[in-house]
Each structure stands twice: as structure tokens, then as C-alpha cells.
Amino acid sequence: MWRLKIADGNNNPYLYSTNNFVGRQTWEFDPNYGTQEERDEVEQARQHFWNNRHQFKATGDVLWRMQFIREKRFKQTIPQVKIEDGEEISYDKVTATLRRSVHLLAALQADDGHWPAENTGPMFFIQPLVICLYITGHLDRVFPKEHKKEILRYLYTQQNEDGGWGLHIEGQSIMFGTIMSYVCMRLLGEGPDGGLNGACTKARKWILDHGSVLASPSWGKIYLTILGVHEWEGCNPLPPEFWILPSIFPMHPAKMWCYCRLIYMPMSYLYGRRFVGPITPLVLQLREELYSQSYNDIKWKSTRHLVVKEDLHYPHPWLQDLMWDGLYIFTEPLLTRWPFSKLREKALKTTINHIHYEDENSRYITIGAVEKSLCMLACWDEDPDGVCFKKHLARIPDYIWVSEDGLKMQSFGSQLWDASLAIQALLATDLNHDIEPILRKGHDFIKASQVKDNPSGDFKSMYRHITKGSWTFSDQDHGWQTSDCTTEGLKCCLLLSKMSAEIVGEKMQPEQFYDAVNLILSLQCKNGGEAGWEPAGESNWLEFLNPSELFEDIVLEHDSVECTATGMQALVIFKKLYPKHRREEIEKFLKDACGYLEKVQMQDGSWYGEWGICFTYGTCFALGGMEAIGKTYENCEAIRRAVNFLLTTQRNDGGWGESYRSSPKKKYVPLEGNRSNLVQTACALMGLIRSKQEERDPTPLHRAAKLLINSQMENGDFPQEETGGVFKKNCLLHYPMYRNIYTLWALGEYRKKVLPQPTKV
């Protein structure tokens, strides 16, 4: 039986940590763990998800929840409440709903203070890892029998009815997701016509019906090439010389978005090395299975720009294809011949040094799932028995997650993000007696997770920004600063610093607050918006160089509504507690941020959310930022327009429901059937409360609160619905804790600001 372990280094000599592994979450399979009744409960959850897999793609993430509830002997003792039609919502019923949520949240908190949860959704994380482990010969050791069984379960469960897989779990089938999943199944031991319900046969038919893997997008071509099922001649060039360009060059790596930079870094190394894994009998079989013509007859040069329409979210401009052709026809032949080959040798050495630097500064976690597999493979290519590769292997468990739909690979974990939101939700309830022990543990986790130092050495020469004082998305070992995680972590610690240390523990030192503020200020763009990871400032025209057909806006760092709004909230709280520290800079930040929000507001009054779905989510955040600086419905046209947007998109049942398709389409798209989504309902409710809707007409608030209250389940949980997160406008991320956090937060604000408190007799 599977179980989750917290903050455990497992005494592995190749693991090291900056804070004793606080926040680390790893799964292990123990054949002797659990009773038969508990195993049956897990199987029931798996079967239930399987039976409904085509209606609900996002898991409830119930396996670890079952484990924690058992271990803590949790039982919901507060009676469930419902609001009948025509009934006025009472303060006491909302209180009961909140207390039920809080009691469950307490049971789900890990010993180190965070809330475990999967952070998955893309259908291109686990597959490249399996490919790289197969190439290196470590697949069976890293993923023994039970691991393989659960990976296959995941692939079967998430397969679409037409036989393919999407870019993410809710997406329509595309070539990239389908070829990666097909190859993964074959590497895990399934035959060409194997798999549950003919999974491999259906997938191969989809691939061949859509032009074969020759029509794969560029990432698919690269992964197949390193496996030996495609040729480098059929890929656009990724010259490692990119990493030795002069800094004045417009396309210098220092000017790129960090994820783009760190994905193409190992890709360019492998390209420069013309790396290909061992050509095994299975690889030769795949060459026969995945093409509609003989492998040896393929004219690879003519296939470089082929991409099936299902994968073409961002078509290359003709000028970009002309650039690739120039590199392919003229530059590459030169760089592979003496004396220019000396330049390639230098470039490869520089590139692998950058890879090692990033590995060391993330404790071999790397910045994310895509980079992890590629950097690990580059290290293996350099030295198959080297320490670097062994350190990479030791960090694979940090990425693995097991749920009712099987074993998958995470983006890298949302521990800090979820914990900081959960603590603010708890504070909104004002249930001091119920939440005090939870707050103390959560406070300890957030304090222990703040990054204490900048990257090692001359980090600017390695294209890195400051990290000291920041918080990451996951844990301290990860090491990569993000502005919104820093602002949410800062908000929590500032709010908790106002409470008694006997209740929530010692507050952070002022210098730690100052370091966080310094990072937030450093990431404001010229237009007033806040960037996510590193300062943004390059001209947007460089986005025409986006080499990926699957994503949008990946070349440069960009600002976002959410990062800007949370930065405003955090700095307003900070300014009240530390009024003399960098006051003028903070006031300028707030003024410019307000101007940015007003400028990027959509015509219908909404704001586009970069990290959640989509206009509902972005509008909630923007209203929070505007409220923080004193903007009101009466004095701000932007707020009036935003309120109108929320009121006009409310559903008949009192909720809100927006489709993930809003993100790629960049226009509001409701859920099919005018359904509501509880997380979006909670976000919209909070947004309206931030505009003081209760002073104008509380009816929409009551209707939303009624839906939330009546949706609470017997144990205090809320049902899992559609996936809640998104990135780069076209791919989803699943945040299962959102259903607990945002519902609690919204109802806490509703009780505090909308309902009159009963008079004490």
C-alpha cells in the first residue's frame, strides 16, 4: 500500500538540504502497510474515479487524505447544515460550516506545518522521465513493479475516448500528449497492442491517422530523437553557442524567461552533442510502429516544420522558420567541422557548467519537471557514474505523486503556495480557538521555507536574480524565487506577527521582512506590473522567436495581474507595520501598480488571470489589490466595471462557472451547461466582498454563500470539480487544495463582513 512521508531525507548520501527537508513530500510503497479494510477503501476510490474518468478528469487527491485522516483518527463531530430555499442564512450556520472545514483542514496538516497536495495536470511530465530513465538504464531501479503499475494506471485513466491524450488532463487529444504516452506505455512493458482496453492500439491508430509522429511539435521531435525513434536531421537547430553570445545580443539567455532558458539549456546541450540513447530492439520496434512509411526512407530535412493542427496553438511566424532554415542550412554544417568545431566544444562546456550551477543551487530539484529529466540526462551523458547524476536520481521522489488515478510527476510541488493561502483563509474565519494550533505549525513552516541567501557565487553571470528573502512555490531547497509566493508568504508572516507569540510562535526578524520587500520591489516592471520570477523589460517583439508551438509568451518574463495585486496587498500591510522602511519606493510601487491594473482591465470589466481560470480568478485578485490601496466602488470606475462583470456572470444557482477555454481564447467562456464551480464561486464571492457589495445589494452574496454551504460534504470537505490552475495560456495545473482553501476563505469573509454578529445575551 502507498503512503506519504513528510520531511524525510531517507539517509541518502546523495541528498542534502538547506533546512532539514522541511516541506519535502515523498511516496513509498510498503506491501505490509495498511489493513485489508484500508486497502479496499483505496481500491474503491480508484474504481470510482475510473468509472467517472470521462466526466471528471481532476482527482480528489484522496489517497493521502485517507492516510492522514486514519493516522490522526479524525472524525467530523460538528453536524452538517443546509440552507433551505427561502431560508435566511444565519451567522450560526455559517459558523458551523467554517468550523467543519477548519477541523478537516487541521487533520490534513502535515507535522511540519504544510498541507500536502498534488500539483499535476500536464500530460508531458512523467513520460519524459520514463524515457530518460530507460535511456540511462535506471528505469527498473527507480520505478519497480508497483511504480510501473501505477504509472500505467495513470495513462489508462487519462486516455481520451478517441484513444489520444491531451496537453493536459482536460484537453482534447494532441500528437504530443499521445506519442509521449504511447512511448511511455511501451517502455513500461506493454506490447504494441497491449494496455488496458487496447490502450496502445487505440493510441497508435490516433497517431497514424493524424500523420504519424512526423507531425509532432518540436518538443515531441526532440524527445523521440534522444530515444532514437527520430533523427536530429528532422529537428530545428538548438545551437549551444547560444550560451556564449555577447550580452548585448538581443536574444541573449539573460533576457529570457527563466523556464524557457532552463528548458532549452539542456536541450541545446543534447543537440550539440547529437545525443542519442542506446538503439535497443524496443527502439527499433517503435521506429516501425510510429511511422506510416519505412524509417529509412524518411526525408528528415523536409519534416522539420511539420506540426499537426491539433498541436498548433502558437504557429511559427514565417520569419522564425526562415531563421531556423538559415541555422540548419548554413550555420550547423560549419559548427560541426574544424576549426569551428572548437567553438562548439567551448559552447558545450559552458552549457554543461550552467546546468551544474542550476542543479547545485536547487539541490538537484531543478526549476521544474521538464527541466529535471533533461538536466539529469545531460549529467548522465557527461558521466554515467558521476556524482551529479546520482544526486539527480536521489531527487526524483520529490516529483512523484500517487493518487486515485495512479502515479504521476508533479510540476515540483505547491507546498508554500497552498500553505500561505490556507493560513490566510484560516485567519479570515476569526475562529481563534479552533485555528491557533494550526496557525503555529503553519507559521513555523513558512518561516522555515523563506530563502535565506542569494544563489551561490557570481550569480549575475549565471543569469540569476536575487533570491534572498523570497519564498518559492514549493520548499526552501527548490531555491527559485517567485513574486506571488513571496508576497503571500510575507502577508502571512506580517499578519501573524500581530498576534501573540505564545499562540503563533516567534515572529520573523525585521530584516527578513525587509529582504522580502526588497525582492518584491525589484520585480516591478516599467509599466507598473509585477513580474513572476525575474525583472522583465525586454521588447515583446522577441516573442516572435517562441520555438514552442504549444505555449504562448514563453520567451520573455511577463507581468501578471495576480502578482501585481498580491504585491500591493503585501506592501500595504508592511507599510502599516514598518512605515519608515523604503516608504517612498513603496508608495511609488503602489501608485504604478494601480495604474497598471487600470490599464490592463478588459473591456467587459474583468481582468485576465495568468495562473487561474481565468477572468473570474484574475478579477478576484485585482479587486483585492485595489481594495488594499483604498479604491472603492464609489471612487473607482475600474471597480464598478469589475463588479458589473461579476454580477452579470453569476449563474442561476448563485455560483460562477468559467471554462478553462477562456485562457487560450482570451475571452470569457462559461462552463458547458451553465454549471457552477465552487472554487470560482468562492473567488467571485471574495471579489464582490472586497468591493463592499454588501453595502449595495447583499443578495448576490447570499446566493453564492448558500451554494457553498450546501455543497459541503459530510466530513467537511468539498467536492472536487474542474481543474483550477493554468499556465502560459494553454495548459492546466491541478490544485486540489483550492476546494478547501478558497471555500473557507470566502465563507470566512462572508461571515465577518456581510452577516450581523448575534447579540450576546
From Swiss-Prot:
Residue ranges of PFTB repeats: 148-189, 639-680
InterPro entries the record matches: SQ_cyclase_C (IPR032696), SQ_cyclase_N (IPR032697), Squalene_cyclase (IPR018333), Terpene_synthase_CS (IPR002365), Terpenoid_cyclase/PrenylTrfase (IPR008930)
Pfam families cross-referenced by the UniProt entry: SQHop_cyclase_C, SQHop_cyclase_N
CC per GO annotation: lipid droplet
Substrates-to-products reaction catalysed: (S)-2,3-epoxysqualene = baccharis oxide
Gene Ontology BP annotations: triterpenoid biosynthetic process
EC number: 5.4.99.51
Alphabetized UniProt keyword annotations: Isomerase, Repeat
Example of a GO MF term: oxidosqualene cyclase activity
Catalytic machinery residues: D484
Similarity comment: family membership: Belongs to the terpene cyclase/mutase family.
Role of this protein: Oxidosqualene cyclase converting (3S)-2,3-epoxy-2,3-dihydrosqualene to baccharis oxide, a triterpene with a 3,10-oxide bridge in the A-ring. Also mediates conversion of other triterpenoids at a much lower level.
NCBIfam families the UniProt entry points to: squalene_cyclas (TIGR01787)
Protein name: Baccharis oxide synthase
Native organism: Stevia rebaudiana (Stevia)
